[in-house]
Amino acid sequence: MTERGCFITVEGLEGAGKTTCLQAIEQMLLEAGIDRPLFTREPGGTPFGEALRGALLDPQYRGLTAEAEALTVFAARAEHLAQVIRPTLDAGRWVISDRFTDATYAYQGGGRGLGDERIAVLERWVHGGFTPDRTLLLDVDPTVGRSRVAHRGDGEDRFEQERDPFFQAARAAYARRAAADPERFRCIDANRPEGEVAEQVRAGVADLLPVGGRP
């Protein structure tokens, strides 16, 4: 019987440095000899999910209700789980996702003010008890994150256009999630320089690697 793969999620606000984090993980898995890890993202990961992602990020839908937003995210997630994440893990491959359900608790539950209860109902329905093996939370001051986004110079999507109160609420929701599940979460100070963040990332996943592949 094929051993199930490992599922790692990377969470954080806009400008937290998730790209740097994912690159560090990719290099680490390569060095450890992990075969064909799959890197994916949320919302997205499937043609259906990517179409919904485009709508969610489009500034023309700025007035979308919080409820519609949460339901759209979970519609994309249901397809992502069924078509990509679960089959890949069952085949013994590792899956690394740029955001997952903790982001919904943060952005819709916290930032939009829906609270945890309604998100939890959707999670139970869509997940059926499924949860990541490890979540790396890149904790960044919203002011720092927004400054990084502004320096990219590629325009702001619908969420990047939000202001500090939204991101402060999302950050607080992330912190509550991490405090409630310390075994799964590894919190990383993403305000630090890129090299230091990469080192924290490597330390955050090292124990998941096969013994011979650990640094």
UniProtKB/Swiss-Prot annotation:
Record's GO cellular component terms: cytosol
Keyword Transferase recorded: yes
InterPro entries, A to Z: P-loop_NTPase, Thymidylate_kin-like_dom, Thymidylate_kinase
Signal sequence, renumbered to the chain: none
Catalytic activity: dTMP + ATP = dTDP + ADP
EC class of the enzyme, as a word: transferase
Gene3D superfamilies xref list: P-loop containing nucleotide triphosphate hydrolases
Keyword Phosphoprotein on entry: no
Pfam families: Thymidylate_kin
Binding positions for ATP per the UniProt entry: G12, L13, E14, G15, A16, G17, K18, T19
Keywords, alphabetical: ATP-binding, Kinase, Nucleotide biosynthesis, Nucleotide-binding, Transferase
EC annotation from Swiss-Prot or TrEMBL: 2.7.4.9
GO MF terms held by the record: ATP binding; dTMP kinase activity
BP GO annotations: dTDP biosynthetic process; dTTP biosynthetic process; dUDP biosynthetic process
Recorded family membership: Belongs to the thymidylate kinase family.
Role description: Phosphorylation of dTMP to form dTDP in both de novo and salvage pathways of dTTP synthesis.
Entry protein name: Thymidylate kinase
Organism the protein comes from: Halorhodospira halophila (strain DSM 244 / SL1)
